[in-house]
Amino acid sequence: LQQKVEEGFRVLTLMTEVDKEVLDFIKQYQVIASHLYWAKRLGIKPSDAVLRRAKESIKSYWRWHIIDEKDPMYLFKGIEKTPRPHSIILNLPLVDALHESKGGFIKDGKLILRLNKKVEIKIPERALEWLNKRLAENPDRKTVRVFERRGRLVAQIILHKENIVIPPSNPLLVVVDINSSYGVVVHYWDGKLIKTEKYKPPNRGMKWHSARKLMKLRDNLYNQGCLTQEKINIYSALIRRTLSGSSRSWVQQTVDKIVRRIRRIAKRHKKDPLVLIDIPNDESLRGSVLQRTLLSFVKYFENILSWYGIYWDESRLYSKICPQCGSELDLEMRTKNARIMVCKNCGFKEERDKIPLYWALIKIKLLPNP
């Protein structure tokens, strides 16, 4: 493990209805920005007429980020390496620093935007409280992004924080096992196992049970010739509604809970945390009903750890290989809450969800290599 730079972001998204004049201004901006994007992408000189139109119709605080390549917020850095978009006119955002002299700023609990005319978006009380807490954590940069989505104005306040982190020498070890068939298991270790917590995503509970029943019923009726296409569509809509909803909120709430606990336990033990994250290989995740939820969890979790400057590392921590001799483990017994694994070579026995902790201790040299 080596010193590295971690970048974390926090985003507050606000939406509001606006009049046609504001939406027309955004669309006009997107046409100009798209022309400059394609000129940059294709390595050709932008049209003088478009540059003149940009100067006349777009204020400088929105304009420089699509024209000046030396601008720190230049939108088109490294676009040559990105996938080529299918659309000619892109939904490019207006971007600027969050400041009273710029295109957007906060005043009296409102986000004030200068979009050809003044636009005020009231920030809900809970969102404003959250934003003030994040601002108190001293982000390095504060920016605002503005774009149109389905006829509504979307504004995102983006806070950015960069931390230089080094691996702690005597850490509070936190092992996060992303399990392709269960969910998330978290171990806290400081010389001994402090606690183990398990988090199961909501889409592994009654929702999937109900969806499977609906799909089985639909397929049986279809095979008997009892369903028209219209009825099949109704069943499909019921299945989608059954599975809709809460995976994103589960990810955010679970990550926030785990990070709060990491910081609290680390403070109580007077140690810096080291978080090792075990992500299953793509083959074990592919086709899993948990795939999207777990990968979203990992991405959001690493982002929040980076925001707080907590050292994390993705590590392969085995659950089917014996940490004592390196042989393959066999399932000895399965209960409602645990799977007991045993090594026929050396006799090692442990709950499967705890085996990654042994490999984490091997990685930081608190246990010998098998």
Q: Where are the language model's segments positioned?
A:
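Intrinsic disorder/low-complexity detector
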Residues: 21, 70-73, 93, 118, ...
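A contiguous, well-ordered beta/alpha segment that forms the leading edge of an enzyme domain
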Residues: 2-66
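Acidic, low-complexity intrinsically disordered regions
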Residues: 34, 58-60, 126, 204, ...
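Acidic carboxylate diad motif detector
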Residues: 41-152, 295
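Positively charged, helix-rich recognition surfaces that bind polyanionic ligands
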Residues: 3-16, 25-29, 155-370
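Exposed regions on extracellular, virion, or secretory-pathway luminal proteins
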Residues: 19-21, 70, 131, 135-139, ...
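Short glycine-/small-residue-rich flexible loop motifs, especially phosphate/cofactor-binding loops
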Residues: 36, 73, 302
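Generic structural motif
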Residues: 17-21, 95-97, 116-118, 126, ...
